[in-house]
A protein has these predicted regions:
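Short, well-ordered beta-strand segments in beta-rich or mixed alpha/beta enzyme
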Residues: 2-8, 39-66
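An amphipathic, aromatic/His-enriched active-site/gating alpha helix that lines ligand/cofactor pockets
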Residues: 24-37, 55-90
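Glycine-rich beta-strand-turn "strand-cap" elements at beta-sheet edges
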Residues: 39-48, 76-102
Length: 102
């Protein structure tokens, strides 16, 4: 399995629109055969900080997700919502490396 942990700092006033776009994308994403989890959380301490958690069966399924139309739409809708001065983080964890062999 592949786990993605993503922290995004949003421009003030953009978090709600980002979450709405994410939820639209999620409707199709969770139907992808390789998707195990696709969730978003908002910080209770700073409403401009979002945490995205994705779990995929393997690297190949994650790569397929990257080419989907619904993800491309989400990316286009949200491309200017991130705070350019905000600190974000991206982490990819291989939970069971043997499962990622093609």
């Amino acid at each position: 399995m592949v786990q993605l942990n993503i922290v995004r700092k949003m421009k003030p006033g953009s978090a709600a629109a980002f979450i709405a776009s994410f939820q639209k994308c999620k409707e199709s994403t969770v139907k992808e055969p390789g998707c195990i989890d696709y969730s978003i959380y908002q910080s209770v301490e700073d409403s401009t900080v979002l945490f995205i958690a994705e779990t995929w069966k393997n690297e190949g399924e994650l790569a397929k997700h990257g080419e989907t139309e619904h993800l491309k739409i989400h990316a286009a809708e949200t491309k200017d919502m991130g705070d350019p001065n905000g600190k974000g983080n991206f982490q990819k964890i291989y939970i069971c490396p043997k499962a990622n062999q093609k």
